[in-house]
Amino acid sequence: MVITGHRQERYSVLIVDDEPAVCKVLADFFSGLGYRTGQAAHGGEALARIEEEVPSIVISDIRMPVMDGIELFRIIRERYPGIRHVLMTGYNVDEYLSLIRRHNIGNILVKGPDFNLREVGQSVGSLLTGDIFGLERYFPGQKLKRAVIESYARSEAVCSLIVQECAGRPDPYLHMAVDELIANAVFHGALHSAGISREEWQADTVIDAENAITVTWACDAERIGVAVEDPKGNLKKVDALRWLDKDDPSGRDLEEHGRGLYLVRRFIDRFIINIAPGRRTECIIIQYFNRDHLHQFKPLWINEI
């Protein structure tokens, strides 16, 4: 989602990176959208800028001299809890997951020569407005298709419909990923709340209508996206981070739910988790048809409001 209209003017973005070229690219991009922008070369300079004018959001590199992005994140959270903060790195985000978990960080962008500014704008726009839900934010103007699932037994049919959208552009992981997300939503979102254990769960167990799972999908010329939503909001950001951490021995190999999320992130180009605790959980996957120009590393998007 990129904010449009005159609303951007009330938001300011502070960009923190020791690479002037990165600061300029992002400053030009956000200025072009109508945001007020500022720049700093490291965390210490960023804090000095914040004392002069508190920004709406800070986008900072992780590796910087004087003060790195993790320490800056910690200080901002402590002193300025109202400031949104997104980290960015040119390295593998997964290598930072233990550190990310320690600070409960949910949003990390991947920078590089092929900086995906559309994704940057969508991520920042959603964080600023708090309007994080909905596949349409990533596929504006595209027709959305929707299915309601009241039993896991319907998963295969829905997965097949979605895969058909990729006719002529087969993807070996899309079916698996959607099925994993539906299974997680059905059990952990609905049946678990109803007191049904995994041992009692059958594929044809029916969910009552108010707890049904919604699957939405859309595609454009470049990619296909799928959103799986449950109305319970049982997933916690801290658990999602733990399950995604490949170095945590207490995670995926012990829990089906965690293993599924780990596999989805590993094999899908973009994985976004949106959580409103106790109200709804939405997992969005986006798979590109042509990966030749994709950055080798993936961003991290876990939003909990």
Give residue ranges: language-model regions:
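Bergerat-fold GHKL ATPase/HATPase_c domain
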Residues: 110, 121-176, 187, 191, ...
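Active-site beta3 strand of CheY-like receiver
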Residues: 53-59
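Conserved beta-strand-loop-beta-strand hairpin that lines the nucleotide-binding pocket
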Residues: 136-143, 186-305
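Two-component/phosphorelay signaling modules centered on CheY-like receiver
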Residues: 11, 20-38
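Receiver (REC) domain active-site loop signature in two-component systems and cognate sites
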Residues: 64
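Helix N-cap/capping motif at the beta->alpha junctions
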Residues: 39-48, 69
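Non-catalytic signal-transmission and effector/linker regions of two-component phosphorelay proteins
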Residues: 1-12
